[in-house]
Swiss-Prot record:
Chain intervals for the UniProt region annotation (CH4): 325-454
Organism listed in the record: Mesocricetus auratus
Name of the protein described by the UniProt record: Ig mu chain C region
Keywords, comma-separated and alphabetical: Disulfide bond, Glycoprotein, Immunoglobulin domain
Region described as CH1: spans on this chain: 1-105
Gene3D superfamilies, per database record: Immunoglobulins
Pfam family, one: C1-set
């Protein structure tokens, strides 16, 4: 005789639940007769789930039948959606049954936020001298997070870059993540007591960390280590990748040891540099090691190990080049000086606009007749997000030369280096007579003293 099905929910057995893989949910119907049965899925708001649904063939179990239906949800739907369950709708003959299948929950962990305060001698370069603030959010889950900066309570819209979120190496237990954001600041703003705020938004909560040269918001006294990836400028000019490990909040340099190694344990030659004291009475140090560009680009993982008598155990920080990084080469446009400048017989200004690139790390240099110009001749802005394409960046570099140099027919070349370019470099050259971009040999600016891989 006909028998209606008994319906059971099926949920993922994966523990801890990952926020990177598809989340599986299912519905089991058993002990029904005859064998004809169908399934459908609805969201909590009753709209139909029309993707990721898979229904398996009916199986005979003794004198009756069983069948299952499975649905795969993208992690974003689980992490950012408001649904607490899906509805499995079972249709068998004249019988319809609805079953609520709870959506698994990813373990939520709030981020730990810390900001590194630069030392007095950390500012360098032509006026205005600059340094960087580092904001690290660590030990958080799930992965979705936003980091932004404020200066004196007002949002900072440019001059900072945020690295891709990376998983932490915790072994067992819930998967956690970390992210580092870097803000470029000027020495004058820092000494004028500007208050900088790192704002971290995660799962509807906001976390703040304020810093200034007065240390109004006292930083943590715990020793902190920050692994800093190689810059493209260093790779482009020196043909080697420099790993940097920044150690902060040191009460003393005594017993400090910073060492780099590969994930397999192979030690790397590490040079340690010490800094002067910070306004809050602590010290900082950095440990640098050069590795082959090929090893870095391949995604090989490296470890910074810090030991100090104030640490209960060695502190290890892992770093590797993100593999999921979106790479887009830049478009380069050179704009000659305006006619109004020539009429006024002022100094000549040439602009190089670099657009639509990713990642944000980029190198811009100016040449005169193929020779590098001094950095005090030009100013390059920090990469900023494209207004209409926030996953891409743009920057511009402004070169100023004398009217005599421009009128003499000197050629000026804007050289742009970026890892997504076919040969990592492109250039545009302009002069008074042509005003049109031409090619120039840029090999003179590249160092031959880089590291060699064996």
């Amino acid at each position: 005789s006909p028998s209606s099905p008994t319906v059971f929910p099926l949920v993922s057995c994966e523990s801890p639940l990952s926020d990177e893989n598809l989340v599986a949910m299912g519905c089991l119907a058993r002990d029904f007769l005859p064998s004809s049965i169908s399934f459908s899925w609805n969201y909590q708001n009753k709209s139909e789930v029309n993707q990721g649904v898979r229904t398996f063939p009916t199986l005979r179990m003794g004198e009756k039948y069983a069948a299952t239906s499975q649905v795969f949800l993208p992690p974003k739907s689980v992490l950012e959606g408001s649904d607490e369950y899906l509805v499995c709708k079972v249709h068998h003959g004249n019988t319809n049954k609805d079953l609520r299948v709870p959506i698994p929950v990813v373990t939520e962990m709030n981020p730990n936020v810390s900001v590194f305060v630069p030392s007095r001698d950390a500012f360098s370069g032509p006026a205005p001298r600059k340094s960087r603030l580092f904001c690290e959010a660590s030990n958080f889950s799930p992965k979705q997070i936003t980091v932004s900066w404020l200066r004196d309570g007002k949002p900072v819209k440019s001059g900072f870059t945020t690295e891709p979120v990376t998983p932490e190496d915790r072994g067992s237990g819930p998967r956690t993540y970390k992210v580092i954001s870097t803000l470029t600041i000027t020495e004058s703003d820092w000494l004028n007591l500007s208050v900088y705020t790192c704002r971290v938004d995660h799962r509807g909560l906001t976390f703040w960390k304020n810093v200034s040269s007065t240390c109004a918001a006292s930083p943590s006294t715990d020793i902190q280590a920050f692994p800093i990836p190689p810059s493209f400028v260093g790779i482009f000019l020196n043909k080697s990748a420099t790993l940097t490990c920044l150690v902060t909040n040191l009460a003393t340099y005594d017993t400090l040891n910073i060492s780099w190694s590969s994930r397999s344990g192979e030690p790397l030659e590490t040079k340690t540099k010490l800094t002067e004291s910070h306004p809050n009475g602590t010290f900082s140090a950095i440990g640098e090691a050069n590795v082959c560009v090929e090893d870095w680009d391949s995604g090989k993982e490296f470890v910074c190990t810090v030991t100090h008598r104030d640490l209960p155990s060695p502190q290890k920080k892992f770093i590797s080049k993100p593999r999921e990084m979106n790479k887009t080469p830049p478009a380069v446009y050179q704009q000659p000086l305006a006619r109004e400048q020539l009429i006024l017989r002022e100094s000549a200004t040439v602009t190089c606009l670099v657009k639509g690139f990713s990642p944000a790390d980029i190198f811009v240099q100016w040449l005169q007749r193929g020779q590098p110009l001094s950095q005090d001749k030009y100013v390059t802005s920090a990469p900023m997000r494209e207004p209409q394409a926030p996953h891409l960046y743009f920057t511009h570099s402004v070169l100023t030369v004398t009217e005599e140099e421009w009128n003499s027919g000197e050629t000026y070349t804007c050289v742009v280096g970026h890892e997504a370019l076919p040969h990592m470099v492109t250039e545009r050259t302009v002069d008074r007579s042509t005003g049109k971009p031409t090619l120039y040999n840029v090999s003179l600016i590249m160092s031959d003293a880089g590291g060699t891989c064996y």
